[in-house]
Amino acid sequence: MPLGGDRERLSLSPRDEALIQAVCSANPRTIVAVMAGSAVIMEAWANRAQAILMLWYPGQEGGHAFADVITGEVNPSGKLPCTFPARQEDLPFFDRSATKIVYDLWHGYRKLERDGAAPAFPFGFGLSYTTFSYAGLKLARDELRASDALEATVEVTNAGAIPGEEVVQLYVAAEGSKVKRAPKELKAFARVALSPGETRTVRLSVPAADLAYFDAATSGWVVEPINYAAIVGRHAADPDALRARFRVI
């Protein structure tokens, strides 16, 4: 096996992609189940499939779980733990023969957002058989000390016709930092189960210490006294995410 892994590309093999294209042409109501351990580039065929299920490596009960999802016995609520790029070039350079590589901050959703590259499927993305709406993002305080915690609440409603679960995600963006920082980073999340039409208040908490960056000059963590934005949404690239500003003093 070549050093560094067993994949030459992030897309499926040409033979697999041709098979998917042929099956989708014969039956537009095709569901594609992908079993893999990391991101897969699907741009060549994703818009042809009726649905795509990312199975990962589900083990011996994976077939039963897959059947439960596609028959509606279970309403899916999983969220991606990584970014699925639209192009392999959007990710950091990868040398299969390297014995060491340094990514620094710039990988995953942090790199794509910095570069203005739209992902195929963002970090934290995942669909359901129902839909959820977000409203009324509120912060308990808009000024925090480094010893405090950011406390946020948001109203989440199941706007569909069946019960479902949503994973509410809170990202924080540092505004005007004196060091290079990611455009935003996930800092908290919460899972909520909702009946059709039900609305619940979801609470999210982030210790101000979690906003720190590591200062190599002092070998310590620093919470900058600057403005920040709390961003609450469905995934890292949610265009409808709610925002509220606060400041660390």
Task: List each model region and its residues.
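C-terminal non-catalytic regions of proteins with extracellular/luminal or membrane-system context
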Residues: M1-I249
